[in-house]
C-alpha cells in the first residue's frame, strides 16, 4: 500500500514523461489507476501527446493506462496502434483494447475483430461480441448467422445473439426461427439483457 501510494505521489510530482513513468510497477490496483488518471487530467486539460509512448510500453499497466487515456480524451489518432494491441499476449490488455474500441466507436476495428474472435478465450469472445454490438455492421450480422451453429459455449452464443439483436433485430428473429435453443436465447436476451 505504501509503495503504491509512493508511486502515485511520484507520478504526481514529476512531469509525465517516459523516463519518469518507466519505474511504474507491472501491477497497479484499480484505485491507483483512477488516481493516476486524475493526476493526468489535472496536469493536462487536453490530450497529452507526450503520453503516446504508453501504448508501446513493455509494462502492461502503462499500456492499459494509455488505452484508458485515449478513451477518456476521445483521442482517435493512430488507431492502428490500438488495433495492434489486440495481438498482445496479455488478456487484460486485449480486454482493455476492446473497451477502448467500444468507447471510441472504432468501426474500422470490425474486420480485425471478426478475423480473430474465434481464436481467443471465452472471455475475449464475449467481450468482443459486446463490442461488435456497438460498432458492427452487416458483416458482423452475417458472420454471426454463418457461425452461430458451430459455437459450442452457451455464454458465447448468448453474446452473439445479443450482438445480432442489437445490430439487426429482424435478422436476429430470422436466425432464431431456425432453432428452438436460439429462440430461447433471443427471448432471454430481449428480456434480461436490456
Write out the residue ranges for each language-model feature.
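Alpha-helical adaptor scaffolds
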Residues: 91, 95-99, 103, 107-118, ...
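Core register positions within helices of long alpha-helical scaffolds
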Residues: 9-15, 38-42, 69-72, 100-103, ...
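Ankyrin-repeat and related helical/solenoid repeat scaffolds used for protein-protein interactions
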Residues: 122-166
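Alpha-solenoid HEAT/ARM repeat scaffold
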Residues: 7-11, 30-37, 64-65, 80, ...
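Generic cytosolic/nucleocytoplasmic N-terminal low-complexity/intrinsically disordered segments
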Residues: 4, 34, 42, 102, ...
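Alpha-helix N-cap/helix-start positions at coil->helix boundaries
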Residues: 3, 7, 29-34, 45, ...
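Amphipathic alpha-helical scaffolding segments comprising HEAT/armadillo-like alpha-solenoid repeats
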Residues: 1, 14-27, 44-56, 75-87, ...
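Terminal, low-structured helical/coil segments at or just beyond the last alpha-helical repeat
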Residues: 176-194
Amino acid at each position: 500500500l505504501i509503495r503504491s501510494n509512493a508511486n502515485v505521489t511520484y507520478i504526481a510530482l514529476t512531469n509525465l514523461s517516459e523516463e519518469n513513468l518507466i519505474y511504474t510497477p507491472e501491477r497497479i490496483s484499480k484505485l491507483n489507476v483512477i488516481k493516476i488518471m486524475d493526476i493526468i487530467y489535472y496536469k493536462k486539460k487536453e490530450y497529452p501527446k507526450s503520453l503516446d509512448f504508453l501504448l508501446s510500453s513493455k509494462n502492461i499497466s502503462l499500456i492499459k493506462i494509455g488505452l484508458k487515456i485515449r478513451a477518456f480524451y476521445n483521442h482517435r489518432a493512430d488507431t492502428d496502434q490500438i488495433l495492434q494491441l489486440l495481438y498482445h499476449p496479455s488478456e487484460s490488455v486485449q480486454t482493455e483494447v476492446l473497451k477502448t474500441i467500444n468507447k471510441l466507436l472504432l468501426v474500422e476495428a470490425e474486420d480485425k475483430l471478426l478475423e480473430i474472435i474465434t481464436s481467443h478465450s471465452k472471455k475475449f469472445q464475449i467481450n468482443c461480441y459486446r463490442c461488435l454490438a456497438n460498432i458492427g455492421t452487416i458483416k458482423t450480422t452475417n458472420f454471426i448467422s454463418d457461425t452461430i451453429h458451430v459455437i459450442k459455449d452457451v455464454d458465447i452464443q448468448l453474446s452473439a445473439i445479443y450482438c445480432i439483436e442489437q445490430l439487426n433485430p429482424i435478422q436476429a428473429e430470422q436466425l432464431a426461427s431456425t432453432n428452438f435453443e436460439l429462440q430461447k436465447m433471443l427471448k432471454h436476451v430481449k428480456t434480461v439483457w436490456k
